[in-house]
């Protein structure tokens, strides 16, 4: 009597894998076009009297364009890393089970935040969101300094003096930045409590970005994909199974199986497509605000 065929779990047929591979190659082509055009796009300055130029002027020195260009630069950086990981060096695909999702998540977050900042038609709301983003960054910087100070205690008088000076300098920078932020808010007619709490939750940012999108039209997909990629960025045994295929290689006869875990190629299609579409949305919003003349 022949041994039973080893069972597959959560697998895909060769035809399904090939179809998914073709879709991934097409998305990679889109990503490469975005990466290749990034440097050219990043050098385009806002048109005089455009909405972005006007936003920058009234919030100076905390410019909205500084935030969005930084976010798109970072998204492009993750795109380049993603393309490198996907290339097996022989003209084919290299599909890692988990590592790709960390970069996909980062692209989604940078793109969503860019769209969240730029999509409101009301200039007051765009500026309020920009100040909220800056407030969040200042809070992080302060927490980082505090974390450093809670590390290994200084052992010598010189070390204590150096740390104390670094803390004073950091606090001075924070006070200066907070004062500048308040002045910008006042110039925009924005109350402190409208921005000082910082950014909303990522789920709210993603909902807003997908609602303003011409590609998703408020669909659930961006937030769902973000939740998946976030889950795969953190340690988890069960979440890996959502994107993996398992092939039984040995049955120990006591309820224990040995399995080989491989990437399920089809599970990468929706995350890649979502990240690419969200980045295209963000690029469209930046182009639009740089070109559209502000109404006075």
Spell out what each predicted region is:
Residues 55-119:
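Long, hydrophobic/aromatic-enriched structural stretches that serve as scaffold segments
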Residues 74, 78-88, 136-143, 228-232:
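Solvent-exposed, amphipathic alpha-helical segments
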